[in-house]
Amino acid sequence: MKNLIAELLVKLAQKEEESKELVAQVEALEIVVTALLRQMAQTDQQALIQSIESALEDARPGSQVPVQDSEMLQQYVKKLLRHPRN
């Protein structure tokens, strides 16, 4: 029983480490996208945002992806593009 608990704790620690890495990657991408958007002229920025949103709409996944997941992705993309980090 102790071995099982120890193994579960090790797996939990590994998952937590993977989660931290993913959070760091997402934050890094947010910083890069924000910096790129700030360097663009307003008209170019709006054109890029519209293009990305249109492509995202065209690539909307089929029934194999839960609607909630698809909507969450769209919300995060819209938030990143329309309300970038400070």
Curated annotation (Swiss-Prot):
Any single GO CC term annotated in Swiss-Prot or TrEMBL for this entry: cytoplasm
Pfam family, one: Anti-adapt_IraP
Alphabetical UniProt keywords: Coiled coil, Cytoplasm, Stress response
A single GO BP: cellular response to starvation
UniProt feature coiled coil, ranges: 1-42
Subcellular location: Cytoplasm
Family: Belongs to the IraP family.
HAMAP family: Anti_adapt_IraP (MF_01198)
Function of the molecule: Inhibits RpoS proteolysis by regulating RssB activity, thereby increasing the stability of the sigma stress factor RpoS especially during phosphate starvation, but also in stationary phase and during nitrogen starvation. Its effect on RpoS stability is due to its interaction with RssB, which probably blocks the interaction of RssB with RpoS, and the consequent delivery of the RssB-RpoS complex to the ClpXP protein degradation pathway.
Subunit structure: Interacts with RssB.
Protein name as annotated: Anti-adapter protein IraP
Species of origin: Enterobacter sp. (strain 638)
